[in-house]
């Protein structure tokens, strides 16, 4: 059995690649079913966020990572050359350590951000629901969650984290000196957009429009900040009002196109618009950036804002890395120990079989009236001979073949004392 992870993330691939290999909710169940049916995979699940797509796998034998990368390319119609250039592969203990780093927020663009742990738990739940988890990989997820909890409680990694939402609003504040006079249009109503709304409100924005596919959710979020709610189809009608547009949905296709933005700019008399597209795949067409009066940024453009704020938590990150390394080593120690369980069970069954056979023989002799002491001596002699016969034969054969290490294993296994050297 082997564990491995295939990772495409914000460090290895730009958003243009990441959006191609993203698994939306409509694709995830189908992808897991296809992977689950592969004979070279025992367990599998997928994590897909705006910053990463990762395949977590357990295989019955040596893993064939390239075959899985080929599958990923075929599924998303991306060339193998393009994918191989931006994939990181982690095996066994490195895979365990990587999963714990991801769950703890250490591998995130935003160091220590808490959202990733929830996303990892969703990936775990998806695998369980698909029937593609239930063994060592399942236990690794549980262990990773426990380590992530320790990192959160025993280090300062999560104190005042700078989120992608915060970074987006921070960039807007550099462009608009007085946010109270601005109107913000938020596309989506998930956790990230909710954080954006909170940061905008704290920054002084009081005119907020929330657009979402589910209008009731948009109304609930808008009500918290005294804003208004619209459906996605209403965006063209309201777009010209927005000075700030921040988008983060799970849509597989762009929601806001160049044509709609051009019309909005005309109605605004070309007053500039600031846009941040946090979504992967992107919600705003890339061509919108060609318009002279639009400042369009993607999640990758927020990196510098985030990195500037990460330096204060570098010490906490080092402490977290130590906890993660220890957690990964501990998991692999127990996982390797499990590999011996079936062998030890067969060994015990064999020994108990020898014991029962010799015991029955002794009972028959006692019932026949034989001397009890002689019967006990025969029982002890029979047990000793039967139990050590096969190991003795195998050790002698190994020594004759030059495999002296077997003798050392026997010494360690039975804690045999070193031979005394007679110097007389």
UniProtKB/Swiss-Prot annotation:
Other remarks in the entry: During catalysis, the active site Cys acts as a nucleophile attacking the alpha-carbonyl group of tRNA-bound glutamate with the formation of a thioester intermediate between enzyme and glutamate, and the concomitant release of tRNA(Glu). The thioester intermediate is finally reduced by direct hydride transfer from NADPH, to form the product GSA.
InterPro entries: 4pyrrol_synth_GluRdtase, 4pyrrol_synth_GluRdtase_dimer, 4pyrrol_synth_GluRdtase_N, GluRdtase_CS, GluRdtase_dimer_dom_sf, GluRdtase_N_sf, NAD(P)-bd_dom_sf, Shikm_DH/Glu-tRNA_Rdtase
Any one GO molecular-function label of the UniProt entry: glutamyl-tRNA reductase activity
Domain remark text: Possesses an unusual extended V-shaped dimeric structure with each monomer consisting of three distinct domains arranged along a curved 'spinal' alpha-helix. The N-terminal catalytic domain specifically recognizes the glutamate moiety of the substrate. The second domain is the NADPH-binding domain, and the third C-terminal domain is responsible for dimerization.
Catalytic reaction equation(s): (S)-4-amino-5-oxopentanoate + tRNA(Glu) + NADP(+) = L-glutamyl-tRNA(Glu) + NADPH + H(+)
Residue numbers binding NADP(+): 188-193
Lineage: Bacteria, Pseudomonadati, Pseudomonadota, Gammaproteobacteria, Oceanospirillales
Residues the record marks as site: Important for activity: 98
Cross-referenced HAMAP family: Glu_tRNA_reductase
EC number assigned by the record: 1.2.1.70
SUPFAM superfamilies: Glutamyl tRNA-reductase catalytic, N-terminal domain, Glutamyl tRNA-reductase dimerization domain, NAD(P)-binding Rossmann-fold domains
Domain of life: Bacteria
One Pfam assignment: GlutR_dimer
Protein family membership: Belongs to the glutamyl-tRNA reductase family.
Subunit and partners: Homodimer.
GO BP terms: protoporphyrinogen IX biosynthetic process from glutamate
UniProt: substrate binding residues: 49-52, 108, 113-115, 119
Record's protein name: Glutamyl-tRNA reductase
């Amino acid at each position: 059995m082997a564990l491995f992870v295939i990772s495409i993330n914000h460090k290895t691939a730009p958003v243009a690649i990441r959006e191609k290999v993203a698994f939306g909710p409509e694709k995830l169940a189908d992808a897991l079913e296809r992977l689950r049916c592969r004979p070279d995979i025992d367990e599998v699940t997928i994590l897909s966020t705006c910053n990463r797509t990762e395949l977590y796998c357990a295989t019955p034998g040596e893993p064939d990572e390239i075959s899985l990368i080929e599958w990923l390319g075929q599924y998303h119609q991306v060339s193998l050359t393009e994918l191989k250039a931006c994939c990181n592969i982690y095996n066994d203990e490195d895979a365990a350590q990587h999963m714990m780093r991801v769950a703890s927020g250490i591998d995130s663009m935003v160091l220590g951000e808490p959202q990733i742990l929830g996303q990892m738990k969703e990936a775990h739940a998806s695998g369980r629901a698909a029937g593609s988890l239930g063994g060592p990989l399942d236990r690794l997820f549980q262990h990773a969650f426990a380590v992530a909890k320790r990192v959160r409680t025993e280090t300062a990694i999560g104190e005042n984290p700078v989120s992608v939402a915060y970074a987006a609003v921070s960039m807007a504040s550099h462009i608009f000196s007085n946010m109270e006079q601005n109107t913000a249009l938020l596309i989506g109503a998930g956790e990230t957009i909710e954080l954006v709304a909170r940061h905008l409100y704290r920054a002084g924005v009081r005119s907020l429009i929330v657009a979402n596919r589910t209008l009731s959710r948009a109304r609930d979020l808008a009500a918290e900040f005294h804003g208004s709610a619209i459906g996605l189809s209403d965006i063209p009608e309201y777009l010209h009002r927005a000075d700030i547009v921040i988008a983060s949905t799970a849509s597989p296709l762009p929601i806001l196109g160049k044509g709609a933005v051009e019309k909005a700019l005309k109605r605004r008399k070309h007053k500039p618009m600031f846009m941040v597209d946090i979504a992967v795949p992107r919600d705003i067409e890339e061509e919108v950036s060609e318009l002279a009066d639009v400042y369009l940024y993607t999640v990758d453009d927020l990196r510098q804002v985030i990195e500037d704020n990460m330096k204060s938590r570098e010490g906490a990150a080092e402490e977290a890395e130590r906890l993660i390394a220890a957690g990964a080593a501990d998991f692999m120690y127990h996982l390797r120990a499990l590999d011996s369980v079936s062998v030890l069970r067969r060994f015990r069954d064999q020994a108990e079989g020898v014991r029962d056979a010799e015991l029955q023989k002794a009972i028959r002799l006692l019932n026949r009236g034989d001397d009890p002491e002689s019967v006990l001596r025969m029982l002890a002699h029979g047990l000793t001979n039967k139990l050590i016969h096969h190991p003795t034969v195998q050790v002698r054969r190994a020594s004759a073949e030059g495999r002296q290490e077997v003798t050392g294993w026997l010494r360690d296994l039975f804690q045999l004392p070193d031979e005394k050297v007679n110097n007389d």
